[in-house]
Amino acid sequence: MRRPFILVLAVALALAAAGCGSSGDGDSGAASGGSSQVKVGIIPILDVAPIYLGKQKGFFSSRKIELTLESGQGGAAIVPGVVSGQFQFGFSNVTSLLIASTRGLPLKVVSNGVASTGKDKADFGGVVAKDASIRTAADLAGKRVAVNTLKNIGDSTIRASVRKAGGDPSSIKFVELAFPDMPAALQAGRVDAIWVVEPFLSTSLGQGGHLIASNYVDAAPDLTVAVYFTSRQLIEKDPDLVKRFTEAMTESLAYADAHPDEARQVLTSYTKIDPGVIQKLTLPKWPPQINRASVQTLADLALKDGLVTKPPDLAALLP
């Protein structure tokens, strides 16, 4: 059962207050040959292809990092896992970290993770059924829209799309659904629209759905969607490890962005996506650099939509 994000933050705050940070029990010690054993909490989706590809290519081992990738339960366990030291690093969408940072969690971004394509109708987005009367994002006002997590990057950027199209986002009824359940829910009419990522975007479009909004693109050009992060305790305890991890991620991101065919192929090593579908997926961008202006936009949207009660301190959160 997926845990609400606010509950997850409460657990993480309790861990931080108890002093159970990564400077304690986390296992980042030297492995055989002098390598550092590093566990990274990830979500096994398309977006994390670069870290798997980087591991295959030896970008981490060449920096004496023995990398273990562990799946979080829909991402819910990753933030408290990093705070407690279960993971040395984690993968998260930016909005989740903005929310966590305003609640006092000792987190720091160390690397970019994934960015939007920056191309309207050629990115993840909002999909409606084939015979729907919804023609533009403005028509989502008053409709039921599925997102994977309430009060997070999905509903915040969908609202941005609706505003951009001239609609009123205040009347949207957001419904929380897991991504794999969204295409069937749309076909059955249980929701009017879904905000969906790959491979479920391709599934829904293959069933006749129509992409009416590229919400990441509408929110900001070249949106930084997700990043890799660590705890401040680990930065203080082992800054050299953090530096080596960041360097390996930078090389992994650049390689994946320049070699899309290899990025597609590595998906077969950690997902169950049909190889035929993999060739049709819309790939995101994996630039090594974080687009700070786009993170500021997400922070502004989070404040505007009530996801945070004060402006996030981006200087403290970003590298």
Locate each region found by the language model.
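Bacterial signal peptide processing site
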Residues: 21-24
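Pocket-lining segment of extracytoplasmic ligand-binding domains
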Residues: 95-96, 180-266
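Hinge/cleft segment of the Venus flytrap/periplasmic-binding protein
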Residues: 310-319
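Short, glycine-/small- and polar/acidic-enriched structural segments
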Residues: 27-165, 176, 192, 211-214, ...
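C-terminal motif of bacterial Sec signal peptides marking the signal peptidase cleavage site
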Residues: 15-19
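Bacterial N-terminal signal peptides that target proteins for export
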Residues: 1-7
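Structured segments of extracytoplasmic/periplasmic soluble domains
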Residues: 54-57, 63, 81, 85, ...
